[in-house]
């Protein structure tokens, strides 16, 4: 298995060369969140990871409550990737649509039902595919099993499952987030296999 991390501006300055030497084999970087909010360190991170040869992917933390908002999040994602010159070929881990409610925003603004959550995942991933970017869905094990109707999405959809512990119970997870506390050089990251 290959060790990976995901990062956002909350991780601060990152020594990408050190991470590569330590054995990090891939990184998934937060591109942005919500209605057109760019992660404050995205350009720095994408250039840093690719600059030292760490294979990368990106994720977009969704605040969408309906399909049209999910499509707008995809348009913004594609715009940013094109703006920084990151073609699909330079992004081997693709694009991931982060569907969760970790900060309670969806709950406090009218949590969509499962049908709408599934439709938003489909809308974002289809829109990114139109731009040529392979795209999958990130969610917790619970959301993948109980909130997202995977039968309504493409049979070729990839899933990145967050389930902390020693095993991943989600069948066929492309990436498994096994911890939110992977310490490398005194800094803490989310860890993945």
Language-model segments: residues:
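Aromatic-lined carbohydrate-recognition surfaces of secreted/lumenal glycan-active proteins
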Residues: 128-146
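Functionally critical loop-and-helix segments that line ligand-binding/catalytic clefts
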Residues: 1-11, 17-21, 150-193
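Substrate-binding cleft of extracellular glycoside hydrolase catalytic domains
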Residues: 1-125, 129-131
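Basic/polar, cationic surfaces and motifs that engage anionic cell-wall
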Residues: 107-113, 137-138, 148-156, 185
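Glycine-rich, charge-decorated loop segments at or immediately adjacent to ligand/cofactor-binding or catalytic sites
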Residues: 69-72, 144-152
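Hydrophobic anchor at the start of a short beta-strand
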Residues: 56, 134-136, 159
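Short, solvent-exposed loop/turn segments at secondary-structure junctions
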Residues: 102, 142-144, 166-167, 180
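Short beta-strand/turn micro-motifs composed of small residues
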Residues: 60, 139, 163
């Amino acid at each position: 298995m290959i060790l990976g991390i995901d990062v956002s501006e909350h991780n601060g300055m990152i020594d990408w060369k050190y991470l590569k030497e330590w054995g990090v084999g891939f990184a998934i970087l937060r591109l942005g969140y919500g209605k057109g909010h760019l992660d404050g360190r995205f350009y720095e991170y994408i250039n840093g990871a690719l600059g030292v040869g760490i294979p990368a992917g990106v994720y977009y933390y969704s605040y969408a409550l309906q399909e049209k908002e999910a499509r707008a999040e995809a348009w913004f994602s594609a715009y940013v990737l094109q703006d920084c010159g990151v073609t699909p070929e330079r992004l081997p881990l693709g694009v991931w649509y982060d569907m969760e409610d970790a900060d309670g925003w969806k709950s406090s603004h009218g949590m969509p039902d499962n049908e709408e959550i599934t439709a938003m995942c489909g809308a974002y991933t289809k829109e990114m595919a139109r731009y040529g970017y392979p795209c999958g869905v990130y969610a917790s094990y619970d959301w993948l099993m109980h909130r997202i109707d995977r039968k309504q999405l493409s049979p070729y959809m990839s899933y990145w499952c967050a389930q902390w512990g020693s095993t991943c119970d989600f069948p066929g997870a492309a990436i498994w987030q096994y911890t939110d506390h992977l310490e490398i050089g005194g800094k803490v990251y989310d860890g993945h296999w």
